């Protein structure tokens, strides 16, 4: 994942643990005990969460979160802010306007191969622009998900994240925080704990 190496590269402790695990076998179709142990630890850190799902990359984790949220809310449209990988659900924002994602970390993201049926399923808003987010939600009642990073290259304006949470609550919308990059760098448990704003789904 982009920027997820919070322990750096070639960390001796991590390398030894990985090598030991590989020696025990590198392919299993069942959950290993370590997965259960880690899931329990994560839920202890985040008592608002009830379940944990593991993924192999940030992009995959984002795609899984979107699918879970869509199934739960039975609405397909997403208001999105920030960078969330290269899967179809995200890149389809550029079907609406080829520049929709340009202000979200990476400009000129290519959407060739993304089904045209996904057009107008993703709406973008810029960080700290609560008015634009409110406008998106007001205009299209099929928006059932707000998907965003807690913070990247700028701090939230005073009350911004709490306003996002309230917008989600008032409109029956699922709020997803992508903390794949922020991770546990600044706060043990993620940046949402620092700002005291609890999402419905978070990923690290």
Task: Specify the residue positions occupied by each region the protein language model found.
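Glycine-rich, flexible loop/turn motifs
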Residues: 2-3, 26, 48, 86-87, ...
């Amino acid at each position: 994942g982009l920027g997820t190496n919070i322990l750096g590269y070639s960390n001796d402790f991590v390398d030894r643990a990985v090598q030991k695990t590989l020696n025990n076998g590198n392919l299993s179709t069942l959950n290993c005990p370590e997965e259960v142990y880690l899931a329990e630890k994560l839920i202890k850190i985040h008592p608002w969460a009830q379940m944990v799902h593991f993924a192999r990359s940030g992009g995959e984790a984002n795609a899984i979160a979107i699918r879970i949220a869509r199934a739960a809310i039975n609405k397909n449209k997403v208001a999105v802010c920030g960078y969330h990988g290269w899967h179809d659900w995200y890149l389809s924002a550029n079907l609406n306007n080829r520049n929709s994602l340009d202000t979200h970390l990476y400009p000129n993201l290519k959407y060739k191969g993304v089904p045209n049926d996904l057009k107008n399923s993703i709406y973008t808003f810029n960080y700290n622009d609560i008015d634009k987010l409110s406008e998106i939600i007001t205009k299209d009642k099929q928006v059932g998900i707000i998907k965003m990073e807690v913070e990247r290259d700028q701090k939230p304006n005073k009350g911004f994240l709490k306003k996002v949470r309230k917008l989600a609550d008032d409109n029956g919308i699922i709020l997803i925080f992508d903390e794949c990059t922020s991770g546990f760098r600044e706060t043990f448990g993620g940046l949402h704990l620092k700002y005291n704003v609890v999402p419905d789904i978070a990923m690290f």
